[in-house]
C-alpha cells in the first residue's frame, strides 16, 4: 500500500484492526513519528526501512490515552482510524480532540455498530485545551474490546468514512455504508487498497 501521511496511518490502522500485517510505502517515517510511537505503545510491532513501514499486532492491542495536536504531535486527521482501533483494544482508551470542533460527529455511527463510546465536553486524556470552557464535545472514552456488528450508516466526510470502513471490516455482518464518495475524494484508489487488505466492498 502507498500513501501520504493520512493514508499511511489509515492503512496501518486497517492492517492492525484486521489482525494482519500491512506494509505501507511512500510516506517518510519522520511524518509518522507520533503515530508510530502511539501504535507501538498499543502493542503493534513496527518495522521501518527507508522504503516502507510494516505493522502487525499478533498479540492484540492495548488501550491508550491520546490527545490530538498539530504536527509533530498526533495530528487530528489520524483520530478517526484510531478511534476504531480503540474499540478493539482490550481496556479503556481516551481520545481528546484539541484542534478542531465537531470532529467527533462520526461517533454515533460507531456506536450504532456496537462501539462502546461515550463523548464528553470535558478535557480528558490530556491537558486542558481551548475547548475546556465551552460546551463543545471533544473527548471520548472507549471501552474495548467490542464485538462490532454490521449496520446501515451514513459517512459525513472522508475521515468518518474511513473509520466506518474499518469498523465494517471487523463487524460480524455486512454493513451498508452511504456516502462512499467521500473516501474516493480523500484517498488514492481506495478500493484497490481495500482489496489488497482482503476487504470485500460492493458498490451499489
Regions found by a protein language model. Name each.
Residues 1-204:
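Short, structured segments at the rim of ligand-binding sites
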Amino acid at each position: 500500500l502507498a500513501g501520504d501521511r493520512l493514508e499511511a496511518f489509515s492503512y496501518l490502522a486497517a492492517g492492525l484492526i484486521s489482525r494482519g500485517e500491512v506494509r505501507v510505502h511512500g510516506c517518510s517515517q519522520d511524518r509518522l513519528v507520533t503515530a508510530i510511537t502511539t501504535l507501538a505503545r498499543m502493542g503493534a510491532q513496527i518495522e521501518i526501512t527507508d522504503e516502507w513501514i510494516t505493522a502487525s499486532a499478533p498479540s492484540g492491542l492495548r488501550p491508550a490515552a491520546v490527545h490530538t495536536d498539530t504536527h509533530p504531535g498526533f495530528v487530528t486527521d489520524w483520530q478517526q482510524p484510531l478511534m476504531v482501533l480503540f474499540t478493539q483494544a482490550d481496556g479503556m482508551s481516551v481520545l481528546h480532540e484539541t484542534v478542531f470542533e465537531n470532529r467527533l460527529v462520526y461517533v454515533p455511527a460507531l456506536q450504532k455498530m456496537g462501539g462502546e463510546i461515550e463523548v464528553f465536553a470535558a478535557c480528558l486524556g490530556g491537558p486542558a485545551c481551548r475547548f475546556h470552557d465551552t460546551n463543545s464535545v471533544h473527548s471520548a472514552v472507549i471501552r474495548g474490546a467490542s464485538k462490532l456488528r454490521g449496520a446501515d450508516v451514513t459517512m459525513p466526510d472522508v475521515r468518518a468514512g474511513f473509520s466506518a470502513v474499518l469498523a465494517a471490516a471487523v463487524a460480524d455482518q455486512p454493513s451498508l455504508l452511504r456516502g462512499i464518495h467521500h473516501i474516493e475524494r480523500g484517498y488514492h484508489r481506495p478500493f484497490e487498497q481495500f482489496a489488497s487488505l482482503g476487504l470485500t466492498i460492493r458498490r451499489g
